[in-house]
Amino acid sequence: MMLAIDIGNSSIVTGVYDENDQLAFIFRIATTHDKTSDEYAMLLHSFFEQKGCRFNDVTGVIIASVVPTIMHRFRRMCQDYLHVTPLIVGPGIRTGLSIHYQDPKEVGADRIANAVAAIARYGAPCIVVDIGTATTFCCIDAKHRYRGGVIAPGAAISTAALSNKASKLPKIELTKPASVVGKTTVASMESGTFYGHIAMIDGVVERIKEEQRLDDAKVIATGGLAYLYAEESKQIQHLEQELTLSGLKYIYDKNQ
């Protein structure tokens, strides 16, 4: 079995691929900075037991992380408990992409994985919209060149900032409102957050296509909140909730 681990700012997603290269199951835990490598090992061991599998049967691991301290703990866990040196997505790893970024090391490992999976599944050119803690856009042209991207505040961050800075505005849940025009403060905030974020997504994608001359680019959405926005978007064509894990599997295979 092989583990694909995506360490994000809000959650850590672990995909388990079986001997037939199929995604067998997924574990999700909240991203916290107080767990040790031993605690992560115990958590995964428990998850495997619940699925009737053996944690020690894992023979390969790949990690994409935007949280370096937690990545180091997972690497230690793999070495101590699985006796495996994990593949870390970063400089020197074969991805099939040409990174056209001023400093290629600045491109997040999760964004690279998303781009690899999007090309494999839908071809290039393509634009990947990852809707999570931040909402990011990745632009890949027909020659598999990663041209760059856009990073915007996520919907949850924007809503939290609004509540924190405006004393009379309450905290709200991210949800699709019943109508665009709200009749209460909460309904108005829900509408502004939901439709405002969709308008931002569609507007940015449209501008990317125009500026980069990628009118035929496929637009793929992923991320923890993608399900909430993809259906209402006029630009998003495909929803791939586990795009990052798929990309990690492709990258792992390229490096064997």
Curated annotation (Swiss-Prot):
GO terms for molecular function: ATP binding; metal ion binding; pantothenate kinase activity. It holds the Pfam family Pan_kinase. This is Type III pantothenate kinase. Belongs to the type III pantothenate kinase family. It is an enzyme of class 2 (transferase). A monovalent cation. Ammonium or potassium. ATP binds at D6, I7, G8, N9, S10, S11, I12, V13, T133.
